[in-house]
Regions:
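Short, conserved micro-motifs composed of acidic
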Residues: 1-147
């Protein structure tokens, strides 16, 4: 999994079969590896489009069932601020088109570092939006049922 490049922000599915992380090669991009046996992982693979783009993707969080990813993406045309949090649903073996979480998670400020609760009902993230205590603060949003 490790290379001469920077790898960070690891995340596992609850069954420990899929390992997601960020690799920085110029811009940040998302990679994954699958578990072969108790001590071996497959070579890492780039998640590719539509998740990774020519822009900057930052940090990734995977739902416990492995069906959703939440991630930071910066400077996208549908963004509300410089960096926003997006999600994508796994359709079979292909990740769907990413969707911006919009307000109340995203704002005109910077949002990043998503971390999804185990039950998938809350997302914790960092933002420098107005109303916090300092430069960057930790925020939480509770998702409504079926949204």
């Amino acid at each position: 999994i490790n290379t001469d490049d920077d790898e960070y922000w690891p995340g596992l599915t609850v069954d420990e079969k899929y390992f997601y992380f960020t690799r920085q090669i110029g811009n940040e991009e998302f990679y994954y590896s699958t578990k072969i046996d108790d001590s071996t992982w497959s070579p890492s693979r780039n998640l590719g489009p539509p998740i990774n783009t020519h822009l900057n993707e930052g940090t990734i969080s995977v739902s416990s069932d492995g069906q959703y990813i939440f991630f930071t993406a910066c400077n996208r045309p549908d963004g509300l601020g410089s960096c926003d949090i997006y999600f994508s649903k796994l359709n079979g073996s292909v990740w769907g088109t990413p969707k911006n979480l919009r307000a109340p998670v995203n704002s005109a400020a910077w949002e990043s570092l998503p971390s999804l609760s185990f039950d998938g009902k809350q997302i914790y993230f960092s933002s420098n939006r107005p109303g916090g205590f300092g430069g960057k603060d930790i925020w939480v949003t509770t998702f409504e049922d079926n949204k």
